[in-house]
């Protein structure tokens, strides 16, 4: 049958969608564009913000509009945390954030029987990591490897622990198998992803940590570049940096989750570190790596945030000098502790986000400018009208005038800043 899939949200969702696509293709089904007519649609939903909830509902309605007679199936965090609301949308099959193989079995049954099914477990009771086939999309150079699921940090603003459950880790032997498979398929870069990869190994009870996993991936992956997902500051210790520095394929791009640069706000968020510990991580990364790209997330207008507290955050992000930032006005998540706190007006949240974005853009342009004159091994991913486009190890996009470089790594000398990226010239080998 013909199946259209739409994915919202994080890299974990993208990874799980790719795993479903592989399995559907193996079962003989045809994947079609989501806007095309299909026998069934899958919406892999997100619930990290209210906007994510809204987009999830919109895509469910769009699927029903695209082909009124098609089976519409939804999975993911929005369905997991908003079961009754999702049921009201007239979805034929609802499953949450677990058991993708059974989800596809149920989808095939629903197409045959036209029976409505809702099968959503209690995420907080999960104890086993669901191993899915690793891989990437056809013609892609970069593959994702999901090594961890779940989170037990329970930040006061976040609904994800309720959507994903406790920490579960991909066993090291399974990780080795998947890395070898990706290497044999010709991928040039592997993105290590999970809901909270800093907690990798906590459930394995044998002392295994994220750096142990990275050393294994480097050993099994050969020349495949390793790119990390989001890290918590506690991960970045001197031992971590000393061992990571010895991995030649590890990209010097570190997304270090921050959320606020004010200690009082961090305490209300239950973030379990302060700005001093965060900055220690920033300094360690810069001590061990040559001008690494340190990126982060920021929430503006968190409940009870004063102008003075926000001013502390602005000063702190300037001190850190991030290469790039993801900035979000605070979004109320019903059922979280922050939802019961005194709320900051939305106009203030958005105004603070705009002010922070201006600082972030200035820092981003400064980081790009520091790249000019340097040479980087660039992994090229696509051809465009202006030439080939890829990413340097620090994840800055690089364009060269030459075409036909897809899935190759070329040394490129950076000659100029080009908007939000870089322009360069391939060096002779």
Locations of the language-model features?
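Conserved SAM/AdoMet-binding glycine-rich loop
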Residues: 72-73, 81, 184-307, 318
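Short glycine-enriched, charge-decorated loop/helix-capping segments at active-site entrances
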Residues: 47-48, 164-165, 204-207, 267-273, ...
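Conserved, mostly hydrophobic/aromatic
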Residues: 175, 192, 228, 256, ...
């Amino acid at each position: 049958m013909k199946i259209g899939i739409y994915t919202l949200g994080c890299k974990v969702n993208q990874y799980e969608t790719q795993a479903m696509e592989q399995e559907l293709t193996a079962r003989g089904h045809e994947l079609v564009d989501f806007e095309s007519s299909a026998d069934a649609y899958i919406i892999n939903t997100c619930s990290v913000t209210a906007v994510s909830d809204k987009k999830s509902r919109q895509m469910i309605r769009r699927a029903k509009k695209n082909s009124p007679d098609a089976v519409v199936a939804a999975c993911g965090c929005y369905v997991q945390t908003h079961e009754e609301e999702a049921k009201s949308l007239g979805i034929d099959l609802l499953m949450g954030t677990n058991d993708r193989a059974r989800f596809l079995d149920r989808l095939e049954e629903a197409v045959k029987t036209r029976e409505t099914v809702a099968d959503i477990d209690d995420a907080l009771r999960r104890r086993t990591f669901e191993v899915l086939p690793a891989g990437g999309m056809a013609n892609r150079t970069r593959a994702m490897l999901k090594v961890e699921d779940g989170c037990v940090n329970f930040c006061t603003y976040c609904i994800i622990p309720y959507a994903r459950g406790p920490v579960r880790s991909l066993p090291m032997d399974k990780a080795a198998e998947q890395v070898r498979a990706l290497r044999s398929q010709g991928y040039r870069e592997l993105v290590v992803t999970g809901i909270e990869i800093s907690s990798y190994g906590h459930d394995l009870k044998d002392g295994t940590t994220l750096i142990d996993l990275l050393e294994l991936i480097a050993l099994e992956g050969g020349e495949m570049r390793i790119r990390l997902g989001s890290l918590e500051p506690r991960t970045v210790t001197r031992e971590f940096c000393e061992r990571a520095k010895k991995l030649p394929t590890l990209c010097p791009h570190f997304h270090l989750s921050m959320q606020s640069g004010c200690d009082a706000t961090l305490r209300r968020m239950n973030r379990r570190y302060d700005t001093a510990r965060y900055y220690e991580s920033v300094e360690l990364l810069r001590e061990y790596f040559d001008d690494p790209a340190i990126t982060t997330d920021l929430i503006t207008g968190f409940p009870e945030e004063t102008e003075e507290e926000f001013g502390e955050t602005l000063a702190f992000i300037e001190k850190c000098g991030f290469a790039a930032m993801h900035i979000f006005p605070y979004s109320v998540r019903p059922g979280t502790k922050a939802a019961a706190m005194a709320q900051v007006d939305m106009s203030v949240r958005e105004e603070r986000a705009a002010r922070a974005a201006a600082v972030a853009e200035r820092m981003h342009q400064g980081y790009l400018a520091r790249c000019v004159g340097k040479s980087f091994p660039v992994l090229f991913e696509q051809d465009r009208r202006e030439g080939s486009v890829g990413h340097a190890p620090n994840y800055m996009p690089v364009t060269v005038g030459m075409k036909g470089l897809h899935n190759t790594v070329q040394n490129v000398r950076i000659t100029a800043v080009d908007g939000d990226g870089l322009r360069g010239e391939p060096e002779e080998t």
